[in-house]
């Protein structure tokens, strides 16, 4: 962080993108300004945005690869220049763009001799490769080479224990961090009581989203993080009332779930994804972050479970109920669900 004295003043609070460029397919840069801020506010905003940009933005990446009968990740495959470990590292670097949630399947199936690049990955329709020229492996002989891949949207850095999988499947340490770097600087303006600060924010991304998109998502995540405090204030509920409040279960479904499964005419809840419901993006994202992907996942939760989800509110609870009423038969809801 840098502090400098500069001349000039800004009369109204505003933000603006002062510079934007594409250095390469996997390196985008953006520079933003926010002013005027009172003394100390620029640090508050800068620190919060930097942490949210680096740790809260979701990204899509390859999390697992299956090679077939490969004894361990340090093995070599006849006709391929790279070892299995080198191929895994190359797959880890592939940058993907997608709004999908949950685990999706992809694959590579080519015949040598030839170079294998990211362009050779067969992806689901809504997943896009940012840089198709990223290298994966070099086939030096006329062999058939196939890999089954798993793709997941997540946030942060996820590691898995290394095991020798008998089926040739190996985990890839997932780096779901579209924002590569963030820097902010603070400039002081004015004199005396009119002194204020200007915040400059620099963002570098990997090309799966623009710096402006990253800034928007980080800001939205911060707002969602503080909404519970605002909601509590609007309700006028004291801490003591909240502490002693008993929360009844949203869905008393577990005891009756067996009967529903036995009913041949029942709805296959594990085949209904929440993507198919008309949920708001806010409610949808809350559920996805909690690994709730199907209607069965949702109905297996109590209200206490849902309210423990980050940014989940009572309004989301009502919205879910209204949505279920719209999509499921009323008699099924009355018989199987209760508040």
From Swiss-Prot:
Gene3D superfamilies: 5' to 3' exonuclease, C-terminal subdomain, DNA-directed RNA polymerase, insert domain, RNA polymerase, RBP11-like subunit. Residues 1-233 are annotated as: Alpha N-terminal domain (alpha-NTD). One of its GO terms (molecular function) is protein dimerization activity. Keywords: Chloroplast, DNA-directed RNA polymerase, Nucleotidyltransferase, Plastid, Transcription, Transferase. One of its GO terms (cellular component) is DNA-directed RNA polymerase complex. Residues 264-339 are annotated as: Alpha C-terminal domain (alpha-CTD). Its EC number is 2.7.7.6. InterPro entries: DNA-dir_RNA_pol_insert, DNA-dir_RNA_pol_RpoA/D/Rpb3, DNA-dir_RpoA, RBP11-like, RNAP_asu_C, RNApol_insert_sf. It is found in: Plastid, Chloroplast. GO terms for biological process: DNA-templated transcription. Its main location: plastid. Coiled coil: none annotated. It catalyses: RNA(n) + a ribonucleoside 5'-triphosphate = RNA(n+1) + diphosphate. DNA-dependent RNA polymerase catalyzes the transcription of DNA into RNA using the four ribonucleoside triphosphates as substrates. The N-terminal domain is essential for RNAP assembly and basal transcription, whereas the C-terminal domain is involved in interaction with transcriptional regulators and with upstream promoter elements. In plastids the minimal PEP RNA polymerase catalytic core is composed of four subunits: alpha, beta, beta', and beta''. When a (nuclear-encoded) sigma factor is associated with the core the holoenzyme is formed, which can initiate transcription. Belongs to the RNA polymerase alpha chain family. This is DNA-directed RNA polymerase subunit alpha. It comes from Eremopyrum distans.
């Amino acid at each position: 962080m840098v502090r400098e004295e500069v001349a000039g003043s800004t009369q109204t609070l505003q933000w603006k993108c002062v510079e934007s460029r594409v250095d390469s397919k996997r390196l985008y840069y953006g520079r933003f300004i926010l002013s005027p801020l009172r003394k100390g506010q620029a640090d508050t905003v800068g620190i919060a945005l930097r942490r949210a940009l680096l740790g809260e933005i979701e990204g899509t990446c390859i999390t697992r690869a299956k090679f077939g009968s490969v004894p361990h990740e340090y093995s070599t495959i006849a006709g391929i220049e790279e070892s299995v470990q080198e191929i895994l590292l190359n797959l880890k670097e592939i940058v993907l763009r997608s709004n999908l949630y949950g685990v999706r399947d992809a694959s590579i199936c080519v015949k040598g001799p030839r170079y294998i690049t990211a362009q050779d990955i067969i992806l689901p329709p809504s997943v896009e490769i940012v840089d198709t020229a990223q290298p994966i492996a070099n086939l030096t002989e006329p062999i058939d080479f196939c890999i089954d891949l798993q793709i997941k949207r997540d946030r942060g850095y996820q590691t898995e224990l290394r095991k020798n999988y008998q089926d040739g499947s190996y985990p890839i340490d997932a780096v779901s961090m579209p924002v590569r770097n963030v820097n902010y600087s603070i400039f002081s303006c004015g004199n005396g009581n009119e002194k204020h600060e200007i915040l400059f924010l620099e963002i570098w991304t990997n090309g799966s989203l623009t710096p402006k998109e990253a800034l928007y998502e980080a800001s939205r995540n911060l707002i969602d993080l503080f909404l519970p405090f605002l909601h509590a204030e609007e309700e006028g509920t004291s801490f003591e009332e909240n502490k002693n409040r008993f929360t009844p279960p949203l869905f008393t479904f577990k005891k009756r779930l067996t009967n529903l499964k036995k009913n041949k005419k029942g709805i296959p809840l594990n085949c209904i994804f929440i993507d198919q419901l008309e949920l708001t993006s806010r409610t949808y994202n809350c559920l996805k972050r909690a690994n709730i992907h199907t209607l069965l996942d949702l109905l297996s939760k109590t209200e206490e479970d849902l309210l423990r989800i980050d940014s989940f509110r009572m309004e989301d609870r009502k919205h879910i109920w209204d949505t279920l009423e719209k999509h499921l038969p009323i008699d099924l809801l009355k018989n199987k669900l209760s508040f």
